């Protein structure tokens, strides 16, 4: 990773992926935390809401635990006439 790549703002997808990985790793340590699905659902909804309007009750999240592996399933029902929100211009800090 170069210095320029490090300073470049990251996309919401990579941030969401990192958050999910951290949450899943944390869940494996605490094993059985009841509010994990709620936390995951809210994080995922917040990322999606930046791009498309989705009804909160149309998002289903399943966490299945196996031997040494957890699987996260996400089902999102998008309306046929879904409108993609315009990207907001990133604010740049003056160094």
UniProtKB/Swiss-Prot annotation:
Annotated InterPro entries: MinE, MinE_sf
Taxonomic superkingdom: Bacteria
One protein family per Pfam: MinE
Keywords: Cell cycle, Cell division
Any GO BP: cell division
Cell division as UniProt keyword: yes
Functional summary from the UniProt entry: Prevents the cell division inhibition by proteins MinC and MinD at internal division sites while permitting inhibition at polar sites. This ensures cell division at the proper site by restricting the formation of a division septum at the midpoint of the long axis of the cell.
NCBIfam families: minE (TIGR01215), PRK00296.1 (NF001422)
UniProt similarity note: Belongs to the MinE family.
Full protein name: Cell division topological specificity factor
């Amino acid at each position: 990773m170069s210095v320029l790549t490090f300073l470049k703002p990251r996309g919401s997808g990579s941030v969401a992926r990192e958050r999910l990985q951290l949450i899943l790793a944390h869940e494996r340590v605490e094993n059985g935390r009841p509010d994990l699905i709620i936390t995951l659902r809210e994080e995922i909804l917040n990322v999606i809401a930046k791009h498309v309007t989705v009804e909160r009750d149309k998002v289903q999240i399943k966490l299945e635990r196996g031997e040494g592996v957890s699987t996260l399933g996400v089902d999102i029902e998008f309306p046929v006439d879904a409108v993609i929100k315009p990207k907001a211009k990133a604010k740049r800090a003056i160094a």
